[in-house]
Amino acid sequence: MIKINISQNFLVAKGHALFAEKGKDIVCAAISGIIFGGVAWFEPDKIEFTENKLVPSIALKLIDPTPNVAVAFSVITVQLKAIANSYPNHIVINEESYE
């Protein structure tokens, strides 16, 4: 199962979806595509991004959350939630309150 922790300025995704065998897992591919596609949009000085293929995990932290950066991060979050709603046995999202 992929576990995703999301806050106002960061997200961490860990694990495998285990929807299908390695290389054919559409759920893992969707999550990776959303996160890596989002990362490609950000200017490098606006974020910190790390990937660990051994664990596996991906972490994204906003360094300079300007309004445009915040909107882009929200889009990533909405997309991840859509996949989680479609595949609840393979993805769980925990949101930290930021009020």
Swiss-Prot record:
InterPro entries: Peptidase_Prp, Peptidase_Prp_sf
GO terms for biological process, alphabetical: proteolysis; ribosome biogenesis
Protease listed as a keyword: yes
Recorded GO MF terms: cysteine-type peptidase activity
Key word Ligase present: no
Enzyme class: hydrolase
Active site feature: H16, C28
Keywords noted in UniProt: Hydrolase, Protease, Ribosome biogenesis, Thiol protease
Enzyme Commission code(s) on record: 3.4.22.-
Functional description taken from the UniProt entry: An essential cysteine protease that cleaves the N-terminus from ribosomal protein bL27.
Family: Belongs to the Prp family.
Quaternary organization: Homodimer.
The protein's name: Ribosomal processing cysteine protease Prp
